[in-house]
Amino acid sequence: MIVNITLANDKTYDITIDRLKDTYFDTKVVVVTNPTVSGFHLEYLKEKISAKQFSVVTIPDGEEYKNMDTIEMILEHCFENRLDRKSLLVAFGGGVIGDMTGFAASIYQRGIWNWGICVSRKP
């Protein structure tokens, strides 16, 4: 199912609610997650996404990790893996993960692609 959202400034975007399908990215993909989500779902995600290069950054659980040290950890991983403007950062989890990944994607090389994959239960 696709839900179209219209913002106050008349900009729109789609939210896709579905099971993840097998997807290949002709670019580098970095997944940002935490130990809780990765413990339940990371292997499933690895089965569904393939890319030129696929790597994972695991940040600690908790609101206290919503800080610049966490952003630095994500950005260092991006630099070490030589992500470019066509690369993709995937927020794999909710709250803190989405906020940190979105911010990191917005400032890395003036902005790179960012996906959010929210997880609500065990597979």
Regions found by a protein language model. Give the residues of each.
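Glycine/threonine-rich beta-strand-loop-alpha-helix active-site module
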Residues: K66-P123
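ATP/NTP phosphate-donor binding region
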Residues: M1-L88
